[in-house]
Amino acid sequence: MIMNPKIGDYIWFICRWTDLPVLGQVTSLKIDPANKNFPYERPYAEVDWYNGENPSEPGPWCGSTSVLLKDLYKTKQELLDSIKFSTTQ
C-alpha cells in the first residue's frame, strides 16, 4: 500500500469492473467526508487508468475512476501479494 501518494505517481489497483490489476496515474487527491453510512473521512485518489503495465509506456488511456488510498499499491507485485495474503487468512 502507498502511504502518501502524490499527484502524477503511477500506482496499481484492482479495477472494480473486471477485478483485475490495473496501472493508473494519480490525478488528484480528495477526502470523502463523514456521512451516515461512513462515520469517518475516507481519503481517495482520482486516477486515470491505462491498458499497459509499464509506467514509462503506460499504453492507451482507458478511463478515470476514484480509488480509496488504502487500495493503492506502488507495484503490481505488492498488489498481488496483498491479494494472496488476504485470501490465506
Cite the ranges covered by each PLM segment:
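Short coil-to-beta transition motif at edge beta-strands of beta-rich domains
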Residues: 2-16
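Short, flexible beta-strand-to-coil junctions
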Residues: 13-18, 48-52
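Exposed regions on extracellular, virion, or secretory-pathway luminal proteins
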Residues: 30-38, 54-55
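Intrinsic-disorder/low-complexity loop/linker signature
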Residues: 7-9, 23, 37, 53
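Short beta-strand-centered aromatic/proline hotspots
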Residues: 20-34
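Intrinsically disordered, low-complexity, charged/polar segments
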Residues: 40-89
